[in-house]
């Protein structure tokens, strides 16, 4: 695989160990592997582009959570976004280095994190007709991708009132090593954010965190990796905002769904029936539930297990509330490089679909997949 070679063999190795030989590895082995190879996971900027600057970090593997919600133009929801960042800041603040803003009311578009005003102060200066736009990263250079990242995007009030512009979003990421060392941190934060934002839906799992301001030049790497890993998130929330208004984008290790959407597929009773609690946990939040699929996130690599039952079963359960069409996950190609657009994007949405007659075989397959453990499950489950 080209990307693995470019980012160092340890990325390929860690993926293979996690998906194929997890039973043979102790937790300490996984942590040691990530510790020894942290610096080799960075993907050079513009790696698959014919032209463009290459002297920066274009992407970093991480766990990423995305939540879609309504009414980001209102004071209450803007306060909720600030509360989310406060939670994130308590964990990631020491690693953050840069803040990017779109159309700031005052100051520069890019600020060193140490010089940035508190988010509530910046938020208060925004009017209802202003877009919410904050992007915090841990990259060494301002254009570098970082394993720690927090993005908040809120559509303008007039767009929100039209009801045709989709949903706003918050996206956060954590390094793979941090999640291994703190096995409940990602789930805790994801559920907390869903609760604060009254999320309509969302997902959390493996992702490639791309440069905040040079995303377009690094999408081809994401496209190539997505061909090899079904468990990898693709596309940015801002680009997917309209599609998010029509239904969920995908399932992942964590999947948030509000009560309105859940009722359309049979409610909590159907969830408990279709997703056995030995493998799936349901955590309540203010407006719905978060479903955890197994003890850890799956890459679902094509050369090991592209169709894990822990992802197939929730996908089929929630398929009827999935957005039917997303348009494009990537921007247009510049020089003929690979992108996930149009029919390819719709195919990606359906990557975990299986014929209904095969569901029974995946329920049988689930019996051989890792179960939840006390160490990997939050206590506040239904």
What spans do the regions from the language model cover?
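Compositionally biased low-complexity segments, especially N-terminal hydrophobic helices
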Residues: 2-6
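C-terminal interaction module
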Residues: 21-96, 215-382
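Internal, hydrophobic cores of structured domains that mediate oligomerization or house catalytic pockets
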Residues: 93-227
